[in-house]
């Protein structure tokens, strides 16, 4: 169940990013205006929404998620939407760590609902949203073992397998189709 939820979130990110890049480029074909106008809108949004909680890579959300801090139910979605908007404007970099933050915060939201340990489910989200968005299976499992330790390698593999199965061959990082 968790792997499917994280897989859907990863697919949502990859799909929305592809769609938003096309839409923003068609609305603002001049890249200079796109960055200028988009930056003004983005800055206002980031300041209005919890005074910068969603700025940067999202390491603050990761730390709060796995460390038992306060995570709000929409943290993952707001981080996802703001990251998609930022990247669609033409800003480069910052895809991987925000995916970790989106997954970890979604995991921190889902864990109490399912009666599961928050750090474990945040870790599952951390790797599964990334894996689904990038159409990778093994690398996220190894990342989970490296970052969170080997004790939960089996849950990492199970969650990642389900996230990978519903990927629909979308891939955030590459434009060539999956060899599957």
Where are these regions (language model features)?
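Loop-to-transmembrane alpha-helix initiation sites
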Residues: 119, 149-159
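Membrane-spanning helices that line or support transport/gating and their immediate boundary helices
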Residues: 15-23, 140, 161, 165
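A conserved active-site cap/scaffold subdomain adjacent to cofactor or substrate pockets
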Residues: 6-13, 17
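Proline/glycine-anchored alpha-helix kink/cap motifs
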Residues: 97-99, 131-142
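Conserved small/polar residues in nucleotide/adenosyl-binding loops
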Residues: 174-179
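Helix-loop-helix hairpins and the membrane-proximal interhelical loops
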Residues: 19-108
């Amino acid at each position: 169940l968790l792997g499917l939820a994280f897989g859907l979130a990863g697919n949502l990110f990859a799909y929305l990013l592809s769609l938003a890049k096309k839409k923003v480029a068609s609305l603002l074909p001049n890249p200079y205006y796109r960055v200028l106008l988009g930056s003004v809108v983005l800055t206002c949004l980031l300041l209005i929404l919890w005074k910068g909680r969603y700025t940067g890579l999202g390491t603050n959300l990761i730390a709060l998620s796995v460390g038992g801090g306060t995570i709000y139910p929409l943290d993952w979605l707001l981080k996802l939407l703001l990251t998609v908007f930022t990247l669609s404007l033409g800003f480069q970099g910052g895809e991987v760590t925000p995916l970790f933050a989106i997954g970890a915060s979604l995991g921190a939201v889902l864990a109490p609902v399912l009666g599961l340990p928050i750090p474990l489910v945040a870790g599952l989200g951390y790797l599964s949203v990334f894996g689904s968005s990038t159409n990778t299976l093994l690398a996220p499992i190894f990342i989970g073992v490296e970052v969170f330790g080997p004790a939960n390698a089996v849950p990492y593999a199970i969650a990642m397998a389900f996230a990978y199965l519903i990927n629909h061959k979308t891939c955030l990082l590459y434009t060539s189709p999956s060899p599957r």
